């Protein structure tokens, strides 16, 4: 979404954007995975979540507001698309003491800043092969 907004491309949102997801800053996710690898019990499953559920449309609107650019395009929702993914991270908190250290709003701002500061890195990724994937996924919607 951020790359699309920065490149003047539409921001595709499934359905009306009412799907709810649990949002978590990437560094918090990486720290949780590292903690599980080091201190988790072998064979156990640990859900990693931020307890920060938000609708997709609200996330996209935050990105547009922060960047001052971007246009939403509503696309046909996927068949069987879950309306809500609820993550219960109680086990990782209780057993390993993990919880996110970055609040959502700080995390989204850091993420947007990363995209602004690292254009040369991500622009290579969204060219060529990735463009074919993107067209297959969203071209007809």
Language-model features: where?
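C-terminal substrate-binding subdomain of Rossmann-fold SDR/epimerase-dehydratase oxidoreductases
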Residues: 2-141
